[in-house]
A protein has these predicted regions:
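Juxtamembrane intracellular "pre-TM" segments in multi-pass secondary transporters
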Residues: 1-12, 191-236
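Transmembrane alpha-helix termini and helix-breaking/packing motifs in multi-pass membrane transporters
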Residues: 34-40, 93-99, 154-174, 254, ...
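Small-residue hotspots at the loop-to-helix junctions and early N-terminal turns
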Residues: 29, 42-52, 142, 265-272, ...
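Hydrophobic alpha-helix/TM-entry signal in multi-pass membrane transporters
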Residues: 11-19, 48, 79, 107, ...
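A single, central transmembrane helix in multi-pass transporters
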Residues: 20, 28, 167-172, 217-283
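Substrate-agnostic recognition of the 12-TM MFS/MFS-like secondary transporter fold
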Residues: 14-30, 54-68, 74-89, 106-163, ...
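C-terminal transmembrane bundle of multi-pass solute transporters/carriers
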Residues: 60-65, 72, 76-78, 82, ...
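Helix-loop junctions on the cytosolic side of multi-pass membrane transporters
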Residues: 127, 131, 175-204, 403-417
Length: 422
């Protein structure tokens, strides 16, 4: 196993603890939003898809802004502020529940604010990991993703217990996760702007050129991503995948649980926990093999295996096989997400890393609500199970493009200097 220096171990501990608390709080929100819409407010598939779109899309602007800020300011300070501000939306929603004022619009507004804060802070969170990883980026990414999966499982299971614990109490726990996470962030070293980014010179002439505007900085990041074909391919393929696959998980699975299997919030939570358990196994299993020489090949091969998972669920299997399918879907997601993130963070130039990560995360986050809207319409017209068919076709197309039209299959990790054993 790779061993990190002691001071790096401590920094990783602070980072992963705060990251785990953030993921626990955010996973509580994700399941609560879905089940409140489907199981409590009894909304139609089209309304659920539209609500997910309204919650997710406005956060896209903040994602690009977060990438700019992540390259310019102390990322630790930005994360602390995001944690503290994230305490507020669950408290507002808890008050609405207590006053018997829970409705679609108050749910959308509070979830939207939480999503905006997540979008603004995510690029800085990813960039800080590069700093604390101490040259073991693949290992650190896999470890943090695995720990995040554990936290997500715990948060999801807590959210699924609203009938036993109470909705207000669960929302208070969500706020506590964000608040305690801010405390652990204090242990991180301050992280200033990118080392390759221009810094002000006190001895420079007063006629020196001003700092680029936020707009021009965002534009530079988008242009950098577009002209970098491998980065463009990874961002585009992940968007395409998330549109149909993450969208299906967000909208189709809750309706499949509710209508096909006559389940409740606890069953949805347990299925989600099994999903993230599969992701957990994937990420901690990857630690044994890190660093990988050819992450792109792993990424593409797993696209084909996802087709089998979606087909199994579409076939309307017994509950036992549904558990198995959910676990392998999570395993698949854990590997593909980690591999794509590894490649993006390895190929990014330091001065553009936060902005490239913001574009990458933007693709993932924008695809899910858009896919939710489209697949909500598909469910309304063709049924819950048929919303899985587009994901099967998309996975086949991703493999074909990545193998034939992109350098993803040939990509080799720069962290390995030894010849490829293959």
């Amino acid at each position: 196993m790779l061993k990190l220096p002691a001071n790096t171990d401590l920094q990783m501990t602070w980072y992963n603890t705060s990251h785990a608390l953030w993921m626990a709080g955010f996973s509580i929100q994700q399941l609560l939003v879905t089940w409140i819409l489907v199981g409590i407010l009894d909304q139609s598939p089209e309304t659920v898809g539209l609500a997910q779109l309204l919650i997710g899309v406005p956060a896209l602007i903040f994602m690009l802004w977060g990438g700019v800020i992540g390259d310019r300011v102390d990322g630790r300070g930005l994360l602390i502020q995001s944690h503290l501000l994230s305490i507020i939306p669950p408290l507002v929603l808890a008050l609405a529940v207590y006053l018997d004022q829970l409705g679609v619009w108050i749910l959308i507004l509070t979830a939207l604010v939480a999503n905006l804060l997540n979008s603004a802070s995510n690029p800085a969170r990813n960039t800080i990991l590069n700093l604390v990883a101490a040259g073991r980026l693949q290992w650190a990414i896999s470890l943090s993703t695995g720990i995040g999966a554990i936290a997500t499982m715990i948060g999801t299971r807590v959210a699924g217990s609203i009938d036993q614990i109470g909705l207000v109490q669960v929302l208070l726990l969500q706020s506590a996760c964000f608040g305690v996470g801010a405390i652990f962030l204090i242990g991180l070293r301050a992280s200033g702007p990118s080392t390759d980014a221009p810094s002000p010179n006190p001895n420079a002439s007063s006629t020196a050129l001003p700092q680029p505007s936020t707009y021009s900085t965002i534009r530079a990041g988008l242009v950098y991503t577009w002209r970098f074909k491998l980065a463009r391919d990874l961002v585009g393929l992940n968007f395409f995948s998330s549109f149909f696959n993450a969208g299906a998980w967000m909208v189709a699975i809750p309706f499949i649980i509710s209508r096909v299997y006559a389940g409740d919030a606890l069953l949805l939570a347990n299925i989600t926990v099994v999903f993230y358990f599969g992701s957990l196994i994937a990420n901690f299993g990857l630690l044994k093999f890190m660093p990988l020489s050819r992450p792109g090949q792993v990424y593409l091969i797993l696209q084909l295996s996802r087709v089998l998972v979606l087909y199994l669920i579409w076939y309307e299997p017994s509950m036992t096989w549904l558990w198995i399918a959910a676990a392998f879907w999570g395993f698949n997601m854990g590997v593909t997400n980690t591999m794509s993130r590894v490649m993006i963070q390895e190929i990014a130039e330091p001065a553009f890393r936060a902005r490239l990560m913001s574009v990458f995360t933007l693709g993932l986050m924008s695809a899910t609500p858009m896919g939710s809207l489209v697949l909500g319409i598909v469910i309304g017209q063709f049924g819950e199970l048929n919303a899985l068919i587009p994901g099967m076709l998309a996975s086949i197309m991703i493999f074909y493009y990545g193998y034939k039209r992109s350098d993803i299959w040939q990509y080799r990790s720069p962290v390995l200097a030894a010849p490829d054993p293959a």
